């Protein structure tokens, strides 16, 4: 008796009409807030596989959504004035698909504050707990340090334009008060929004507060902040000054480090055409 061919027991292929890709109008799931969810009840999967890979040091699988985002995107903003267009940009931040589909970012955007016609624009990295709760950039102790810096310059928040490089707080599993810096991908997705802000505000100088902001604006890679500060750079046809983030000043008592930040602020004031007194020039210098 001959041996017949073994039956094919492989499962049939799925129907052609079945697709794992979500519908175009599907939004990412609402993430729990610290007030609503105890830390032991947050499902890590709700933050997306990509974030788990980031936290575990694994490169995520590349998809169409991982394609490079052009730095120079032309947004169709409503309004005639810069203020109206900035308001339109604020609405776009909430609904723009590249940001909306980022599972590694939380749900609440934190846009800019201050004067949309300011000569000085300051850019910090991303919202943390305080910023997400209060809805403004640089809140909490870091914000208090910024306010003190501005007061020493003869300014207040209403005199500058303050914004984030990344407009959403980077997410973490079981996140309550802890924060994390934005990833390179989150910065890449967010950069066209910042560029549009700079083009609308048209400041005389942009101040990059911290290494992350500097890396995003200048595309400086792993160049340390110490090598970037002390001079002016150019990005988006605008002079850029790099200095330490106010949060750094909270962690150091070194007067020489504080003097470095103040020297940067003096250069920013000169670039913006602001008057500088002899008293201001002598701040944080050793007493004779």
What do these predicted ranges mean?
Residues 1-288:
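A polyanion-binding, active-site-adjacent surface
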């Amino acid at each position: 008796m001959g041996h017949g061919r073994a039956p094919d027991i492989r499962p049939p292929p799925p129907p052609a009409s079945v697709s794992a890709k979500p519908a175009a109008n599907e939004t990412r799931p609402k993430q729990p807030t610290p007030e609503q969810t105890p830390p032991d009840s947050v499902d890590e999967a709700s933050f997306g596989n990509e974030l788990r890979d980031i936290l575990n040091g694994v490169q995520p699988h590349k998809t169409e959504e991982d394609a490079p985002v052009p730095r120079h995107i032309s947004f169709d903003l409503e309004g005639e004035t810069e203020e109206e267009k900035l308001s339109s940009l604020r609405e776009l931040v909430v609904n723009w698909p590249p940001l909306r589909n980022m599972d590694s970012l939380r749900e609440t955007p934190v846009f800019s504050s201050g004067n949309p016609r300011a000569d000085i624009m300051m850019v910090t990295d991303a919202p943390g707990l305080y910023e997400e709760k209060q809805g403004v950039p640089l809140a909490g102790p870091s914000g208090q340090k910024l306010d003190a810096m501005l007061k020493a310059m003869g300014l207040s928040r209403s005199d500058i334009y303050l914004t984030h490089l990344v407009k959403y707080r980077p997410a973490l599993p079981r996140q309550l008060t802890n924060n994390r810096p934005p990833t390179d991908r989150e910065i890449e997705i967010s950069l066209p929004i910042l560029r549009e802000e700079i083009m609308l505000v048209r400041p005389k100088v942009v101040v990059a507060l911290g290494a992350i902001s500097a890396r995003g604006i200048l595309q400086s890679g792993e160049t340390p902040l110490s090598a970037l500060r002390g001079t002016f750079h150019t990005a988006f046809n605008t002079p850029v000054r790099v200095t330490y983030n106010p949060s750094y000043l909270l962690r150091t008592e070194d007067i020489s480090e504080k003097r470095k930040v103040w020297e940067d602020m003096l250069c920013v004031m000169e670039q913006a055409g602001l008057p500088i007194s002899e008293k201001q020039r002598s701040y944080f210098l050793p007493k004779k």
